[in-house]
Amino acid sequence: MNLQYKYKSQDYDQFIFCLEAVPDVETSSITEVVKNLERLALEQGIASIYKTCDSIEGLEESLTILLYDDHNFKDYEIIYLVMQGKRNTICLNNYYYSFEEIAELFEGKMKGKIVHFANAKILDLDQEEAQYFLDITGARAVSGYGVAHKTINSNLLDKAFFSLCQEFDDVVEIVEELHQKHYALCKALDFRLYY
């Protein structure tokens, strides 16, 4: 069973598509991510779709459904991925997939989107890896954190980032504002954005 939450946005024209890796999609539970998306909708009016996956096939299926069955896909500015992993991999069902494999899975499907990773995994791309991901996927930017902190969750900074993405079009301006408003947290989690 897959949880799906969709909220109506009064204030914004763009939405978030969140895909969270879980051990088993058949087991439904309300995760911290779901609670934070609910707060984001209630407090800031930013709508989201939330889905879970437990395999690379589930990730691909969710993305395909979003791309081809959701006629509002163009309105999803942020693809929010909450997945474990090491450095530049994601882990699904105890299998590790490289960033190159993920880029190829998303090939040409992320045009104009910001792909954002929660701090459940470290995002540490060199310039060549970042450019490859952006070129292959068509994404406008990829963002995440250089620190997968066990005691500091990125939810607060994620929400601030999502809100700024609604206010500003320029990714440089978004990052500057984020650092001005949340400098200590940006430094602690090593927020980074590649574009």
Language model segments and positions:
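A domain-level signal for caspase-like cysteine endopeptidase catalytic cores
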Residues: 1-76, 114-118, 136, 140
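Conserved beta-strand elements of beta-rich interaction domains across eukaryotes
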Residues: 22-24, 86, 122, 149
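A short acidic (Asp/Glu
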Residues: 27-29, 90-94, 126-129, 153-155
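Leucine-rich repeat
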Residues: 34, 102, 127-130
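Catalytic-core segments of thiol-dependent peptidases
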Residues: 52-124
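Active-site-proximal C-terminal subdomain of hydrolase catalytic domains
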Residues: 123-195
